[in-house]
Amino acid sequence: MFDITRKCVEWGDRLLVIESGKIARQADGAVVVDYGGTSVLSTVVSQKSKEPVDFLPLTVQFLAKSYAIGRIPGGFFKREGKPSDRETLISRLVDRSIRPLFPTGFCDEIVIVCNLLSYDQVSPPETVALIGAAAALAISGIPFPTPIAGAKIGYIREEERYILNPSAEELARSELDMFYSGTKSSVVMVESEASELSEEEMLGAVTFGHENCAQVLDLIEEFAEAAGPKDVVEFVPHDIGKVVSDISSGYSEKFSVAYSDHNKKTRVLQLDAAREGLYSDLCRKHVEESGEYTEQEVLLAIKTFERSLVRARVLDTLKRVDGRGFDQIRNIEIEVDLIPRSHGSALFTRGDTQALVITALGTPQDEQVVDGFDGDRRERFLLHYNFPSYAVGEAAALRPPGRREIGHGKLAWRAIHPVLPTKADFPYTIRVVSEITESDGSSSMATVCGASLALMDTGVPLKSSVAGIAMGLIKEGDRYAVLSDIIGDEDYLGDMDFKVAGTKDGITALQMDMKIRGIGFDIIEKSLQQAKDGRLFIIGKMDKVIKESREGVRDHVPRMESMIIDKNKIKNVIGTGGKNVREICEKTGVKIEISQDGTVMIYAVSRDAVEEAKNMIMCIVSEPEVGKVFSGVISEIAKYGAFVSFLGGRRGLVHISEIKNEHIGSVSDVLAVDDKVKVLVIGIDKDHVQLSMRRVDQDSGDLLEHESYSSSKKNGPQSGDASGGASGFRDYASGPARERRRSGGSGGRPVRRRSAGSSGSGSGGYYSVPQHVGTPDPVNGNDRRRGSGPQHASGGGGNKKPRFF
């Protein structure tokens, strides 16, 4: 029933298997590729285009279902929705790799679907998907003259060692994350993120990928020969030379004048007018009257003419469309801090390309939770690229971000990511939004420059400035020209889009797309060196505006501070059922994250709220010490004194003799429940705390100088009172026996008795004696804290199951 063709080879340290003839037999081409534990079903179907077009209507879709990793989708519907960004990026990798290899003039609709069947989280699915797509095309009968293969490349700088298809563990140690694709003779596509690698190291990675793909290309050829195509699609390119000659003789002057205009807007208007009249004339002559050509061939002839005109001008006159030299950068204008309430902003303008980049900082609770087939993770750096239609002067409805926006945003993300501080050094969640307000080529690289400037304006401590530049190529036979900072027309009519971003010390991102069937290593090497010169020039311009990140963040940025407490005190801070931490959050308006290692992260919109929350937490975790002053609340009144709740629920007794420096007839005459007081710890007997009010200024909390505590001075002015004395707990807590009986117990029972009103302190803060004599309460604005209490730490929250409140 099944006519199965199967070929395999040992590639790297894993077995690569290509098989067809069993699954999806009605597709023009269908293969299952297994590599290690990763398996992808790739299918190809084609049909004639419904409308005349001058491009290849190719659609590539990579799909990753959760069953590939043995999971059921989350959410209510338990079914996959729209493609994730990761799926979109892999789809683009496959598309950009195979598109240049189709013959010129072939405009049939082609749909390629790569379905991830199994994923071992070791073998990269993008590698398997591209090999599957190439193998499916090879047996489909669709004109695809040469096979292509791809591989993921890593690099360990310390060992000077490149890695073929690294695992996730190896990739975490690698300074390079590159995807390479190419044929036997040339490089077709490169996408990479690097930790400031040199041009030589990047070129070495491309060479390594090219060499290691050779055996896969041999395998695809062997497989295609064994399987054979089902039905060959006949494609014989129609000679459109006659139409091109007609255009050259009658319309060459109009196009030459249009392409001589250095202003993009007027140049576009002239070109549109020339094309409109030309298309109608050619269709009437060559389609309607003679019937010799189709509308699609007329469109292709116009594009061929324009392409040859511009390319000849560049190679013959050594001048580009806008009059620049090959290595000349457009005029650059830079401005930072231009959006008032943003956390940081920059406007980067290069010629007619402009990016308005704005940043926003958030707490770790704002991190994006990514639930993908690579595993769940939290992303703290977000970069979003938006390209509205007005950027190119078009009237079109705004739509959600498409593949292009996602791809350009990811490229800029890769360029900036290697220079960001660690979470321990800068725990904020960072979002960068690039609004492309004008575009004439290289908008993704303008985003890189603008993002670097905006982050420095925000106060994010970047390692270095990052700049990006897009390189182009015009190649005719053995003649070629590498162009720096290409504009839109040079991208449209050229042969290469080669984008390089990095710092003064090295490359952080590289992307190469070809429109011809690949290039040699000599052109890549020249492009890298010319891109380096341009990158350093742009960084010099950027450094004149802002060279280093600003000190600190703006006042309206969410405040974030950390403190470390004893792990045994975590339950005290949380409280029964979260009572204490909820009370802190509700009172101060902060958010609190507590990790199992004792790290407490506090997030708020203002510094005052953070300080108040810190003081409340310190009150809970601090231990009372003799000689320290605390704020507290009267929780219970007794005949012999008053019980005070302080330090988040600790109870102590202020004996009647320690309330005032004068005779008191009754405690209730001067104190009442819920009164806020300042108390000095004068004695601790196990869990029983003896307090004094009379030795402390009740307004400021300062210790009265003539009443500095001394163990020898244990009697107050009421020395004649039978219950006086300050040295022992029993003297303060016990009182006369008849008073103990009225209190419902003996032996200090009143101190142990709980009161419903003793759950919290009226105000936070503590004072050291004698170092802090005259020091105001931290709650009232002073940030000086010494002595006992939790140590403070700066940096990120703990990584052991944090709890959020």
Curated annotation (Swiss-Prot):
Single Gene Ontology MF annotation: polyribonucleotide nucleotidyltransferase activity
Keyword RNA-binding among record annotations: yes
InterPro entries in the record: ExoRNase_PH_dom1, ExoRNase_PH_dom2, ExoRNase_PH_dom2_sf, KH_dom, KH_dom_type_1, KH_dom_type_1_sf, NA-bd_OB-fold, PNPase
Cellular compartments annotated: Cytoplasm
Known cofactor(s): Mg(2+)
One of the protein's GO biological processes: RNA processing
S1 motif domain segment(s): 627-694
Positions with biased composition (Polar residues): 709-721
Keywords: Cytoplasm, Magnesium, Metal-binding, Nucleotidyltransferase, RNA-binding, Transferase
Residues bound to Mg(2+): D491, D497
EC number: 2.7.7.8
Function: Involved in mRNA degradation. Catalyzes the phosphorolysis of single-stranded polyribonucleotides processively in the 3'- to 5'-direction.
Entry similarity comment: Belongs to the polyribonucleotide nucleotidyltransferase family.
Protein name stated in the entry: Polyribonucleotide nucleotidyltransferase
Species for this entry: Anaplasma marginale (strain St. Maries)
Taxonomic lineage of the native organism: Bacteria, Pseudomonadati, Pseudomonadota, Alphaproteobacteria, Rickettsiales
